[in-house]
Amino acid sequence: QKALEGIDGEIIVIDNASSDDSCEMMKAKFPHIKLIENKDNLGFPKGNNIGVAQAKGEYICILNPDTVAAEDTFSKILSFVKSSEVEIFSSNSQLGIIGCKLIDGAGNFLPESKRGVPTPWVAFTKIFGLYKISNYFGKYYAQHLSENESGKVDILVGAFMVMKRELYLE
């Protein structure tokens, strides 16, 4: 909620048939947030589709239910989107999906934040730990980029993805 302060945005929460009182808690504590209560557990992807269909913004963020966004996350991402850096990373000046540096509850960087395509060779180097020896073997975790560096990657983890709504609907 604080991450959207000063930003014209909305929060849509999809509940996939929770058996606890989380929907009642959401209604009581966050009455301005749009809550969609599914009668059945349709799964994360279908829940995303339902939420995006209701969204009104130009950009959407797919966010795992256990992910916490820092207060400046969305303002930084929107600034990045509007900057010239986007053209550097996209060959045809069309923005794809933006991810961010993910950290765990202890504050440690999650290398899964950015990955390469797991070809048989790339998977082999990961399984046998070769990526720890040299960045030459670091394609699985896209080690061509440091944890604090922006750049193009093949795969983003689904815990946090920002994109134009139009792109998602394609």
Show which residues each predicted segment covers.
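Short, acidic, metal-binding catalytic loop of nucleotide-sugar glycosyltransferases
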Residues: 1-8
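A conserved acidic beta->alpha catalytic loop
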Residues: 15-24, 40
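Glycine-rich, basic loop-to-helix element that forms the pyrophosphate-binding segment
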Residues: 37-55
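Short aromatic/hydrophobic "clamp" motif used to bind/position activated sugar donors
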Residues: 60
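The conserved acidic donor/metal-binding loop of glycosyltransferases
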Residues: 64-68
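Conserved donor NDP-sugar-binding/catalytic core segment of glycosyltransferases
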Residues: 71-112
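Short, flexible, basic/aromatic active-site loop/helix in glycosyltransferases
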Residues: 117-153
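Aromatic-glycine-rich donor-binding/catalytic loop that engages nucleotide-sugar donors
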Residues: 142-170
